[in-house]
Amino acid sequence: MTHDRVPHPGGGFNPPEPTDKGGPDYHRFVEGVRRLQDHARAVDAPDDVITMAADRLEELSALLAPFDADEWQSPSGRRMDLPMRGNVLTIPMNAHKTDDGRVEGWARFARFHLGRNGAVHGGSLGMLFDTVLGLTASVLTGSRRQRTAYLKIDYRQIVPIEKELQFDAGVDSEDGRKIFVSARLRDGDTLLTEANALFVRLKPGQP
């Protein structure tokens, strides 16, 4: 399945237009996809069960295929009434701005994000920190359009799956269009990972 990328005339990271597309069951749809990903990572079923599941997945893909849309039309990422705006890619999390000018919240990695030996896959941590730090840059500076220039992660401890973890993040400095940010992920009092990143504000119309 391939689609030509349709650039937005206003450039990259334009504010998404809110929608109610998908109706009242879109949240169930997103959560169902997440559960399916977890089962796909964990399942040890008999061959005939896998065959039946594969058949049903092909049927489901055929059902949805005629309705594929570009990123500007899909409700994914535009359902403001749902957690993470209904984006199925994002690590489940919740964040808020604190009174002292930082961003705090929680995140929970699922079975789908498992690497080996009970540890979250390192790439999944990259996805979380990119989301958290991008949000931090936007919320704390008021910048609406920026892209990641670099992201560095220091892995201190094994990060567990299926457990609510805590993060905090802040803006370290700004230099023109550059926004330097950092964050920490904890399990209670235990520091699990640290990250720092540079985000660059986009110029008008810049992709």
Spans of features found by a protein language model:
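Hydrophobic core residues within well-ordered beta-strands of beta-rich domains
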Residues: 89, 101-103, 149, 165, ...
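Long amphipathic N-terminal alpha/beta scaffold segment
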Residues: 50-120
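A short secondary-structure junction signal
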Residues: 115-119, 165, 181
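HotDog/MaoC-like acyl-thioester-processing domains
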Residues: 1-71, 159-161, 172-207
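OB-fold and OB-like beta-barrel modules that bind single-stranded nucleic acids
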Residues: 168-169
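Active-site helix/loop of acyl-thioester processing domains in fatty-acid/polyketide metabolism
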Residues: 98-102, 120-143
